[in-house]
């Protein structure tokens, strides 16, 4: 991809505004991923490699056993393949403990979780309107909100990382809503949190929902890491994942029409390349139609075959148990390295990565320098500045651990060449 973006080259005003705003932020990542030969170990991209041997075998069997001539046609169904929707319903009703049973009419499929969020924003917001995002938040929202829907993520700053899980976040939301320079239409959270990799407590989820009801906002809960929870005695609170689907909305005076949950196969099952996302909206038929219109033919029948096989598989409970065990072991391996070199980190138990505070990085420039030193050693990590954390919290990085054990060990060996001489 050319780095010369000085001239619009006949783009629409809308298209050029998006390119001009985003390319300077992502050109280095684009260049890195475009290399034909790349010996760097990527601990910056949140992908789960830990179940892939089992999943490869399961997906091969699915294609071998279940691929039929009909799968070469456009997918049937308005909001997704009917068999896939049934499998999703079975999955949500088993693992998300919904207060209201999930039915096929509540679902709309899309090619990935970000596509689900995009279709929600397209139907919730007009161009130029905003969505509240408590920081730190996943930096993919920065361009994912803007590319098609032209929606602005509105940072809600907090004094410390821990404040994300206290009542202080509600006060911060109220203040940001009051001073926002644009109309605010929704609040979005990732639960489990990205990049902090812990779960929100149920009482705080209820507070978020009441805040949205008070201000007539939509509530979007991105629950893409819902089943990537593992045991960690370092995490004293918020051990268990609680889905927004599980909350009795009527009992707290919240209209279910404003609540939307997003999930995909990407993280819990390590299938980010399959592009299989789904939105659950249980009491808003108009929204469900809008979501289906936006993405009803964009999911692959081949991916659907594999998803149906996996979600309905009798092996699913054991696969989830293996995933949790392997995540726990990988987390211990990485954090033992952190402890050895005095690297502080945010204790995690729900996700694929650790948010770690790099040593000798007290400014944004020093953070960038520390990231570049690791890159020079052959390890890519994701700099904390991109996640919009507190101004007082400089020098952080999100570091993936959900890779094959031998790859993680090699990454640690490379990182030791940096930290052993500091």
Predicted regions and their residues:
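N-terminal small-domain helix-loop-helix segment of the aminotransferase-like
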Residues: 4-112, 163, 168, 311-312, ...
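Short beta-strand
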Residues: 40-42, 262, 344-349
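Helix C-cap/helix->beta junction micro-motif
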Residues: 214-215, 341, 377, 422
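PLP-dependent enzyme catalytic core of the Aspartate aminotransferase-like
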Residues: 90, 98-101, 254-255, 281, ...
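Conserved glycine-rich beta-strand-loop-beta hairpin in the small C-terminal domain of fold type I
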Residues: 324-335, 339, 344-358
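Conserved core segment of the aminotransferase class I/II
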Residues: 91, 246-325, 332-338, 413, ...
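Conserved core of the PLP fold type I
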Residues: 69-214, 220, 226-253
